[in-house]
Swiss-Prot record:
This is Opsin-1. It comes from Schistocerca gregaria. Phosphorylated on some or all of the serine and threonine residues present in the C-terminal region. Pfam families: 7tm_1. Disulfide bonds join 127-204. GO terms for biological process: phototransduction; visual perception. GO terms for molecular function: G protein-coupled receptor activity; photoreceptor activity.
Length: 381
């Protein structure tokens, strides 16, 4: 009885009816009339998506949203309330968690609602707002990661000769990140490109299908300043970070050989080891960001350069990978951050990972020790 009722639902009967599984319907048929002016003619050639895809997408986005909000919320809480973690460098970590938190807090529920109705039902204004939030917090995340990479470059490559980051300079960088992000993401509201429904009709994003150069130029310039430039800066920073780490390890091996000892670990060497651990954590986070957002960039470039036909199902994966990125960061820090794990165990014993024996060699505390020491020296001078 239940199965008969399910099969008789309009979405299922529409999907299975007619030639090829569709009764002359398109993916646009369920779109409310007030939204049609935003829908590109490209999408009218595609039949409705299988309702199971909408159900699967809604479920996955819901799960990712819960994990991201809880995970990033805990990162913000623990880094903000644990004294040993309240350092200038970790202000950037908190800002990254804040951006990821807001990404899923503002986007998972609307997408879940639209997946239930199998189309965008929240109106044109919410479509623009949804797309703006996705662009804003995505931009905020990558530029925060860029600032983290530059901070690691400053500490690891330049070492004690570098000017330490203070709370003031960290806050100025965070202010720049958000001012820069807002400036780029409000442009489509003023006519440089626009925010429109994606092909699956349950999410909204930039218009990469309109063929005029006003729209195309925004995608190209935005991609440079919000993707390629920060990515290039990150690669540049980590290239020299890895060079410095390699040179340090080579120096340590030669010193051990000369002194004929199995192990040589001075306080400075332990400090550098902690710096290297943080560099690996940050590099892992950035790699996950790269794999999360690159599919969406490829979809945008495919649209403006017409290299292949973009299907509604393809746009689902672009949206999904981009939003999943907001889940990665708290997991990475939870696994690889001893001091974070120690604070997590203290504040949330039932949720904590098993504490490791090297909690005193925290990646975060090690990462900022050099900066703190330089601050003290400059103050005493």
């Amino acid at each position: 009885m239940a199965s008969a009722s399910l099969i008789s639902e309009p979405s299922f009967s529409a999907y299975w009816g007619g030639s090829g599984g569709f009764a002359n319907q398109t993916v646009v048929d369920k779109v409310p009339p007030e939204m049609l002016y935003l829908v590109d003619p490209h999408w009218y050639q595609f039949p409705p998506m299988n309702p199971l895809w909408h159900g699967l997408l809604g479920f996955v986005i819901g799960v990712l949203g819960v994990i991201s909000v809880i995970g990033n919320g805990m990162v913000i809480y623990i880094f903000s309330t644990t004294k040993s973690l309240r350092t200038p460098s970790n202000l950037l970590v908190v800002n990254l968690a804040f951006s990821d938190f807001l990404m899923m807090f503002t986007m998972s529920a609307p997408m879940g609602i639209n997946c239930y109705y199998e189309t965008w039902v929240l109106g044109p204004f919410m479509c623009e707002l949804y797309a703006l939030f996705g662009s804003l917090f995505g931009c905020g995340s990558i530029w925060t990661m860029t600032m983290i990479a530059l901070d690691r470059y400053n500490v690891i490559v330049k070492g004690l000769s570098a000017k330490p980051m203070t709370n003031k300079t960290a806050m100025l960088r965070i202010l720049f990140i958000w001012a820069f992000s807002v400036a780029w993401t409000i442009m489509p509201l003023f006519g440089w490109n626009r925010y429109v429904p994606e092909g699956n009709m349950t999410a909204c994003g930039t218009d990469y299908l309109t063929k005029d150069w006003v729209s195309r130029s925004y995608i190209l310039v935005y991609s440079f300043f919000v993707y390629l430039l920060p990515l290039g800066t990150i690669i540049y920073s980590y290239f020299f970070i890895l060079q410095a780490v390699s040179a340090h390890e080579k120096q340590m091996r030669e010193q051990r050989k000369k002194m004929n000892v199995a192990s040589l670990r001075s306080a400075e060497a332990s400090q550098t080891s902690a710096e290297c651990k943080l560099a690996k954590v940050a590099l892992m986070t950035i790699s996950l960001w790269f794999f999360g957002w690159t599919p969406y960039l490829i979809i945008n470039f495919t649209g403006i350069f017409e290299t292949m036909k973009i299907s509604p199902l393809l746009t689902i994966w672009g949206s999904l990978f981009a939003k999943a990125n907001a889940v990665f960061n708290p997991i990475v820090y939870g696994i690889s951050h001893p001091k974070y794990r120690a604070a997590l165990e203290k504040k949330f014993p039932s949720l904590a990972c098993a504490s490791s024996s090297d909690d005193n060699t925290s990646v975060a505390s090690g990462a900022t020790t050099v900066s703190d020491e330089k601050s003290e020296k400059s103050a005493s001078a």
